[in-house]
Amino acid sequence: MSSGTPSPPTNPTRPPASTVPDRALADLVDHVRTRFYGLYRGVVTDNNDPNSLGRIKAQVPAVFGQIDSGWAMPCVPYAGDQVGIAFLPEVGSGVWIEFEGGDVSYPVWVGCYWRASELPPDVAPSVKVIATVSPFELKFDDDGGSLTITDNNGNTVTLDSSGITLSNGSEQVVVSSSSVSVNNGALQVT
């Protein structure tokens, strides 16, 4: 029998105590290396989802280089059976991409961003604009107290405190609480 400190008993089903934290740390490091958390800039390469779910494919250089992502699910503020907000970014648009659980196999597009020259005109803190490529536009002006709808031919409908104005550029009809005016008073109905 040797003199000195006795050895602790061994348990063949349990690894030595010093390797448990080391293995947990190694697992954590491996997990972090293979997961991508946070927002990544991407560019839409395909928006023609074969399943019509609002999905897109995007190039996300920081994650995939020049290879397209898989189909990225949309993250929208409101969705349900036959209801919701449905906006799909155009091919070439800048999008923010995240990955569900950090797993690159489950991309999610969570929004879009503008490049320097892409911001719609007349945008200010008091003016909210929804604009399409066509261009159709819906403009809310909180300071001016108006709502304007513009179609792709330049025709407008404006609702404000003075009434409703319909215009096609050269002609207009103004409906107020007391009258209807056509072409700046050429015809007036009171």
Residue ranges and their predicted role:
Residues 177-190:
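Long terminal segments
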